[in-house]
Curated annotation (Swiss-Prot):
Signal peptide: none annotated. GO terms for molecular function: small ribosomal subunit rRNA binding; structural constituent of ribosome. The gene is rpsF. This is Small ribosomal subunit protein bS6. Binds together with bS18 to 16S ribosomal RNA.
Length: 125
């Protein structure tokens, strides 16, 4: 089986459907004997340029190991699902399990906010 990186962008009005979509897509990969190595829901983000007069979209990143038949099925599903604005499937040489730069940057910012909050509590005492 080959390794793939899949990114798809969902219409912002359909954000509540994203968890169901993720479950459906990962389920089809696992049913075919594949594995999901990385799954990141980046949430709503600003688009670089408008798509269908929209300026935001809900982003999802998946790194999977799956047979070609499942990938073809996913691409067809993306193509005919009106909620999916754009999708990209890339073949990779090996499994990617570490956090993406988007996720790593988000995690680096969280502790900074907690540190500032702790400094504020110390100043009150």
């Amino acid at each position: 089986m080959r390794h793939y990186e899949i990114v798809f962008m969902v219409h912002p009005d359909q954000s509540e459907q994203v968890p169901g979509m993720i479950e459906r897509y990962t389920g089809s990969v696992k049913e075919a004997g594949g594995q999901v190595h990385r799954l990141e829901d980046w949430g709503r983000r600003q688009l670089a340029y408008p798509i269908n007069k929209l300026h935001k979209a809900h982003y999802v990143l998946m790194n999977v190991e799956a047979p070609q038949q499942v990938i073809d099925e996913l691409e067809t599903t993306f193509r005919y699902n009106d909620a999916v604005l754009r999708s990209l499937v890339i073949h990779t040489k090996h499994a990617v399990t570490e956090a993406s730069p988007m996720k790593a940057a988000k995690e680096e910012r969280k502790p900074l906010a907690e540190v500032e909050n702790n400094d504020f509590e110390d100043a009150e005492e």
